[in-house]
């Protein structure tokens, strides 16, 4: 919701770079959490002594942390949370950018190609992560995460390139970057009262409920 508000308020260019930066920050935290440099640091001591009990969440059995959980896992979870916020922001931003660039053209083909390339990115992660982890004969997970950080750095650079390309497009067409009306709290009521919104939301819930658990546990199946 907040990503949509930022996108409507600030436009595609700003939100694209913001989402890329957020993803890179989250992934960098994730990488540092699994490196040897994190072991014995002050951050490790802090995570060992904190976040062992979260009132309310523990009673419901849905706490992301627990007593005895490794500090590296806690810090990596924080980084992954930040990364996930950037991912969702990037998802809607890319869709908005495609609508702008391919309006009146092969928009459906462009969106389909974008989704196909995104799935190839997931496949790349699955295929090459074990390869990087086993480089040199010594298994080190941090190398796989570092590979992801490098890819995200490249992605951020591409977002910056897109920023200038989109700005050049506006200059050529004589149009300003399209921004929606300022966000109002009443807009949430209109969205939540729409049956179409709930239908699409339910489809997304069902889809991701099937895909993400499978991705997580498929490794153990193999």
Briefly describe each language-model feature range.
Residues 2-11:
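Helix-to-loop junctions at the C-terminal end of transmembrane segments
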Residues 73-117:
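Cytoplasmic helix-loop-helix junction between adjacent transmembrane helices
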Residues 68, 72, 84-92, 123, ...:
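Small-residue-rich segments within alpha-helical transmembrane domains of MFS-like 12-TM solute carriers
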Residues 108-133:
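Glycine-rich segments within core transmembrane alpha-helices of 12-TM secondary carriers
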Residues 142-162:
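Symmetry-related core transmembrane helices of the 12-TM Major Facilitator Superfamily/SLC fold
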Residues 42-47, 163-187:
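Flexible cytoplasmic inter-helical loops of multi-pass small-molecule transporters
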Residues 21-68:
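C-terminal ends and interior cores of transmembrane alpha-helices
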Residues 194-222:
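Extracytoplasmic gate region of multi-pass secondary transporters
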